[in-house]
Amino acid sequence: MTNKTITLNLGPQHPATHGVLRLILEMDGEVVNNADPHIGLLHRGTEKLIEHKTYLQAIPYFDRLDYVSPMCQEHAFALAVESLLECSVPRRAQFIRVLFSELTRILNHTLNIGSQALDIGATTPLLWLFEEREKIMEFYERVSGSRMHSNYFRPGGVAEDLPENLLEDINKFIEQFPSKLNDIENLLNENRLWKQRLVDIGVVSQKDAMDWGFSGPMLRGSGIAWDLRKSNPYDVYDEMDFEVPIGKNGDCYDRYLVRILEMYESIKIIKQCIVKMPKGQVKTDDPKLTPPTRGKMKESMEAMIHHFKLYTEGYDVPIGETYKAVEAPKGEFGVYLYSQGGNKPYRCRIKAPGFAHLQGLNFMSKGHLIADVITIIATLDIVFGEIDR
């Protein structure tokens, strides 16, 4: 008697695929023999579009890649442009960037843990964590005018200084947030059903994690303490005191714990940013990069012309190439820029962490049940804006 396998299409409209993932599963009963992800359904040609935009006009495209953690991607692009321009960034702007990068990490991890719990069948964590996410989105809105696509980080600094009382409100948020995280831990950490669904599921060894190019919680969950904020610090991360949480077994449960612990570390970094926040400018004083203030534009025709030309023609970037990466919530997000000396990039290559993680889905899900595939997709923390680009 021969074993007959069946082919099952999971997605692209299934809610548990976290986007437009079409997963072709080869099944032996309920056991997965092979998982073949088909991507590209959200491809928008972002890298090509950026070639036809000025460096300033390119920033909003980065918000729309991993739209769950937009500011971290703006950060990578801003660092890459600054590297080519060899411009300095005011210290206040660097602290603001680090502050909002860590708020963005919390924004990302709360959604991941909440949606992962929902996929498995627990509704409560999602509702609790969305209350906290709403508060961070209000901080986004107050600083940039937008809840999601912020367009806030700029080459040479940030778009605007922090509004009045914002630091006090962020401080109030991080004072009460650990108790909410503690509630989630009490609900899930030793929960029998939660552990049955996560422990020993989707195990990634240290060798596999390295071979497949994993980064972020996917790498640290396997016990490798690699974090760009420590190994290759940017802005003022070298002045921050924080730990890099790592797992032991490389399973879904360890990756969940790593994300929980990372949020506690983000709180520590945010506190340090608030305490150490210096006074001063938030944009470089180079007039080629920084538009004149509204006050100056009301007084000077030259300032008005300067503002108009800056936003229509942009600024020229010297010939050269660079690669800059940041420790985004999902892993290493990198931007390779190649300039031929004009006001638009000749080439902008984007390295998204989720792309490498999704390729590992096949070996992670082999031999598991179809219900476990849902858990593994959730632990990958994939967003198709950055994978398909």
From Swiss-Prot:
Cellular localization per UniProt: Cell inner membrane
Predominant location category: membrane
Its job: NDH-1 shuttles electrons from NADH, via FMN and iron-sulfur (Fe-S) centers, to quinones in the respiratory chain. The immediate electron acceptor for the enzyme in this species is believed to be ubiquinone. Couples the redox reaction to proton translocation (for every two electrons transferred, four hydrogen ions are translocated across the cytoplasmic membrane), and thus conserves the redox energy in a proton gradient.
Enzyme Commission code(s) on record: 7.1.1.-
Alphabetical list of InterPro entries matching this protein: NADH_Q_OxRdtase_suD, NADH_UbQ_OxRdtase_49kDa_CS, NDH1_su_D/H, NiFe-Hase_large
Membrane topology listed for this record: Peripheral membrane protein
Any GO MF annotation of the entry: NAD binding
This protein's name: NADH-quinone oxidoreductase subunit D
Pfam families, per the entry: Complex1_49kDa (PF00346)
Taxon lineage: Bacteria, Pseudomonadati, Pseudomonadota, Alphaproteobacteria, Rickettsiales
PROSITE patterns named among the record's database cross-references: COMPLEX1_49K (PS00535)
Keyword Transport: yes
Family, similarity comment: Belongs to the complex I 49 kDa subunit family.
Biological source species: Rickettsia prowazekii (strain Madrid E)
HAMAP family linked to this entry: NDH1_NuoD
EC top class named in words: translocase
Keyword tags: Cell inner membrane, Cell membrane, Membrane, NAD, Quinone, Translocase, Transport, Ubiquinone
Gene: nuoD
The protein's assembly and partners: NDH-1 is composed of 14 different subunits. Subunits NuoB, C, D, E, F, and G constitute the peripheral sector of the complex.
Gene Ontology cellular component annotations, sorted alphabetically: plasma membrane
